[in-house]
């Protein structure tokens, strides 16, 4: 059993998908999708800090998009900056960057196989990607 819950984030330029673990550390469930505006530096950090405190989260896992050759591109740099902003706002929390290559594609495939409509997929894809990121992390620490 974990001492605290773990939050998983899929950070994009317009949304942040959020997933949360159970206290056993076995499963990740989709929690929410935050609307953000990266261009205007509106990153939803205050909302995220509230979610972290309300859910007694001790660790946050942020997806780190890498290129297939393991290099970090533009989206990866943006995720690292997001981590730094979050860490400034809540220094007591552990933040882990997790290789998220293909997590959004896996989430999309899973939703397609479940015959979810395009409109519904668009609403939940980031949350689903956060679930894939967090579940990968949880599986690695078992």
UniProtKB/Swiss-Prot annotation:
Ranges in coiled-coil conformation: none
UniProt KW Hydrolase keyword: yes
Family: Belongs to the YqgF nuclease family.
Record's subcellular location: Cytoplasm
Physiological role: Could be a nuclease involved in processing of the 5'-end of pre-16S rRNA.
CDD domains, alphabetized: YqgF (cd16964)
GO terms classed as biological process: rRNA 5'-end processing
Enzyme kind, highest EC tier: hydrolase
Assigned GO CC terms: cytosol
Species, as recorded: Staphylococcus epidermidis (strain ATCC 35984 / DSM 28319 / BCRC 17069 / CCUG 31568 / BM 3577 / RP62A)
Protein name (Swiss-Prot/TrEMBL): Putative pre-16S rRNA nuclease
Its EC number(s): 3.1.-.-
């Amino acid at each position: 059993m974990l001492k605290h819950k773990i939050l998983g984030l899929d950070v994009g330029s317009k949304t942040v998908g959020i997933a949360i673990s159970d206290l056993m550390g076995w499963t990740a469930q989709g929690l929410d999708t935050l609307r953000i505006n990266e261009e205007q530096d509106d990153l939803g950090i205050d909302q995220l800090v509230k979610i972290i405190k309300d859910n007694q989260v001790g660790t946050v896992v942020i997806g780190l998009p890498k290129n297939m050759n393991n290099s970090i591109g533009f989206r990866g740099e943006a995720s690292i900056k997001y981590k730094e902003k979050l860490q400034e706002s809540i220094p007591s929390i552990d933040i882990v960057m997790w290789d998220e290559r293909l997590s959004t594609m896996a989430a999309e495939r899973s939703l397609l196989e479940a015959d979810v409509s395009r409109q519904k997929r668009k609403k939940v894809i980031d949350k689903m990607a956060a679930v894939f990121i967090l579940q990968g992390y949880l599986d690695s620490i078992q």
